[in-house]
Amino acid sequence: MEISVASVTISVVLAVVSWWIWRTLQWVWFKPKMLEHYLRRQGLAGTPYTPLVGDLKKNFTMLSEARSKPLKLTDDISPRVVPYPLQMFKTYGRTYFTWFGPIPTITIMDPEQIKEVFNKVYDFQKPHTFPLATIIAKGLANYDGDKWAKHRRIINPAFHIEKIKNMVPAFHQSCREVVGEWDQLVSDKGSSCEVDVWPGLVSMTADVISRTAFGSSYKEGQRIFELQAELAQLIIQAFRKAFIPGYSYLPTKSNRRMKAAAREIQVILRGIVNKRLRAREAGEAPSDDLLGILLESNLRQTEGNGMSTEDLMEECKLFYFAGQETTSVLLVWTMVLLSQHQDWQARAREEVKQVFGDKEPDAEGLNQLKVMTMILYEVLRLYPPVTQLTRAIHKELKLGDLTLPGGVQISLPILLVQHDIELWGNDAAEFNPDRFKDGLSKATKSQVSFFPFAWGPRICIGQNFALLEAKMAMALILRRFSFEISPSYVHAPYTVITIHPQFGAQLIMHKL
């Protein structure tokens, strides 16, 4: 009896170990090699598979080397920001595959194929290969299928253009405060001085999202912004170890810190949402900020079709992060580029004077700023907030003339596409807002070659919000100052989820 029990136990253990070894080999070797063979058979070129790590190590080595050297102001930023994808593009052409660990990732640069990926939202879904990436915020940007459709339907009213116009006074108040601080700094030095505008722009855009989303000030939401900024840095560091199975669950110092920061954000937001819900019940809650509009839209849903409190908090986290991050980087690169191109700075300032005169900027006037719109589009083309978007395929499907197997990912390289001379001409790396003088459709030849906010059904819901806020900020800045590059400025764009200035943005501000 004892022998038979021991034998059974050993057999079970061996079976479990064998099954685990087989699953591991399947994941680390057999499936990747099968997918690689499938792709190469169709004529797709790409890198050979390195077990487990794929191309991650090579990618990060090249990125570290690129970041060690700053750029000239006139340089294309691609070699510093996306050196590995750029090298792959030069080596393999416009469609190729690389490896995110054991997962093949097919990069496509053909506008028709990009359009197809954006349009087929149920076939090309958000990947979930790096769970830590959602610790900052899940929300609408990370959902798929019916959940994405439901959240989009509920959130849409908050970003209706008429609702956003009502938020313009809040834009004005937040922007005016930071411009006033810069004015004081310059006045204290005489009529001009060096200002690192990056911290001020971060503070300004954070204050805007606090006021417009939650009816509060930056100081009340400051802790959330601090924690999300810390999380962004930790996630970028953790990304280097993404190929280690189960890494996100290991109790490392950085993982523990990420989870603690995420819990603290959750507690703060739960307090904000619960306080607003109690105020609504008492008939005292404002309904003109994003949270108020969102709650109202959610309540209008039929029983069971609304969002849970947890869902609401995830959307609030996304409001905080995306709402602040996208506009702050758009503004900092706009100021850097206008410092370099004084002719466009003068044209933008003249337009602001013509439209507003001595009046304060309002929604109607901001929408008349054609030159400013051209400038912002060109900044978004050269410095898109994120450098690429990724989609996952879970079943075999066609993309153009390719047949793609389930289990691969698609990379849409925003930066490379928007800098591509084949799509944008020989001056693709140069700052030339005139390319947008006849509108987006003419500039892109009606192709999907400009997608800083994504495209199609999943286009960024906050696009109009970000652009109107940026116009308000630039209108106030241009009326008060002229500005140029400081000798101490180091041109070093780098990615912390979005493209940041690595060493700040030091400009010489002249009071007008």
UniProtKB/Swiss-Prot annotation:
CDD domains: CYP72
Membrane topology: Single-pass membrane protein
Cited SUPFAM superfamilies: Cytochrome P450
Protein localization: Membrane
Assigned protein family: Belongs to the cytochrome P450 family.
Spans through the membrane: 2-22
Binding residue positions for heme: 460
Stored Pfam families: p450
EC number annotated for this UniProt entry: 1.14.-.-
Disulfide pairings: none
InterPro entries xrefs: Cyt_P450, Cyt_P450_E_grp-I, Cyt_P450_sf, Cytochrome_P450_Monooxygen
Cofactor names: heme
Record protein name field: Cytochrome P450 72A15
An example Gene Ontology molecular-function term: iron ion binding
First-tier enzyme category under EC: oxidoreductase
Main location: membrane
Keywords: Heme, Iron, Membrane, Metal-binding, Monooxygenase, Oxidoreductase, Transmembrane, Transmembrane helix
Any one GO cellular component localisation term in the record: membrane
